[in-house]
Amino acid sequence: HNYNARLCAERSVRMPFLDSQTGVAQSNCYIWMEKRHRGQASAPGQLYTYPSRRWRKKRRAHPPEDPRLSFPSLKPDPEQMLKKEGLIPPDGSSLEALLRSDPIEKRIIPDPRDDDSLTEFPTLSRSARKRILEPDDFLDDLDDEDYEEDTPKRRKGKSKGKGIGGARKKLDAAALDDRDKPYACDICGKRYKNRPGLSYHYAHSHLVDEEGAGAEDKEDSQPPTPIMHRSEEQKSKKGPDGLALPNNYCDFCLGDSNTNKKSNQPEELVSCSDCGRSGHPSCLQFTPVMMAAVKTYRWQCIECKCCNICGTSENDDQLLFCDDCDRGYHMYCLSPPVAEPPEGSWSCHLCLDLLKDKASIYQKQS
């Protein structure tokens, strides 16, 4: 109780601060009243009434704008031209005065005025700063965005700060998009969250004319856009058939096609068509039927696996894998849909039509 009382008392008297417990920026909410603030009850069931404080936004004391930051008029007058000469640095003003044969008085008069304007600026800013820090003002209720938006406009007087902020926001949004969707199509630049989505896009959009596009990209010595430059780097990792170049080693035993380090026997590698990772069928625990089936389609590893019907890898916890061909299917994409994964082995409709009674689902049940 004492700790909470001290914490609440500290929050009531301190300036806005970042609470380390909740991570919230605490501000003075003016809910703490004293006995002298009590008034008579105005409605049945009330004991006291307290005066309400109407919220008002702080009227900022803007320092006088430096005339050097003001926009020039469209039709310059002779008097304004003389004023501008006083605002130019000393070397430039004296040089122009000599060239125009102006008297020395015109060069001397603007100097103290500039000095006064420069000396008045910090004094006014100090007084404005004192007024900002007064406890009676309601600056606590102002958002930080008010300061961030108004301060650059008052200081520079140009729209340059706004443009920079907008460009920075666009860059941040682009960086977030790149981070959320790291896999980009090397032909059209479309981005995906995972590699299976990108491979599905390749298979249905660019697989037919990928060879011709690859030949045209090789002729260009200097690609016009960074996307095309990135596409050439990615195309170098793909074969002429659009498949990823396979690794020459097994991801599980680190052996190659000549030696399986688990069995010390030569064994052919099976490679993923999307990422190029390879593995021995025995390391992948493939059956002989599955070893023959994976050679007939674009096989995908477990990390790149997507549904053979909808082509996406979303809801991978709903994917069923065929025990005969290792294809993946969403349980809700099947016809009819399946609510729970079946017990034992399961065969897809393609393997049931091809293998008939030799499918794994019948072998396990018999």
From Swiss-Prot:
A UniProt-annotated Pfam family: PHD
Q: Where is the composition biased (Basic and acidic residues)?
A: 76-86, 229-240
> Which SUPFAM superfamilies does this chain map to?
beta-beta-alpha zinc fingers, FYVE/PHD zinc finger
Q: Where is the signal peptide?
A: none
Keyword rRNA processing (UniProt): no
Disordered, as annotated region: 41-94, 140-167, 211-243
Specify whether Transcription regulation is a keyword of the entry: yes
Extract the CDD domains matched here.
PHD1_DPF2_like, PHD2_d4
Q: Which GO terms describe its cellular component?
A: cytoplasm; nBAF complex
The UniProt entry, under Gene3D superfamilies, shows: Zinc/RING finger domain, C3HC4 (zinc finger)
Where in or outside the cell? Answer: Cytoplasm; Nucleus
Chief location: cytoplasm
Zinc finger boundaries on the chain: PHD-type: 247-307, 304-354
Residue spans of biased composition, Acidic residues class:
140-149
Going by the UniProt record, its keywords in alphabetical order are: Apoptosis, Cytoplasm, Metal-binding, Nucleus, Repeat, Transcription, Transcription regulation, Zinc, Zinc-finger
Biological processes annotated in GO: apoptotic process; nervous system development
**Gene Ontology molecular function terms on file:** zinc ion binding
ZnF (C2H2-type) residues: 183-206
- Name the PANTHER family for this protein: HL01030P-RELATED, ZINC FINGER PROTEIN UBI-D4
Function as written in the Swiss-Prot or TrEMBL entry: May be a transcription factor required for the apoptosis response following survival factor withdrawal from myeloid cells. Might also have a role in the development and maturation of lymphoid cells.
Q: Which family does it belong to?
A: Belongs to the requiem/DPF family.
Q: What is this protein called?
A: Zinc finger protein ubi-d4 B
Species:
Xenopus laevis (African clawed frog)
Q: Which gene encodes it?
A: req-b
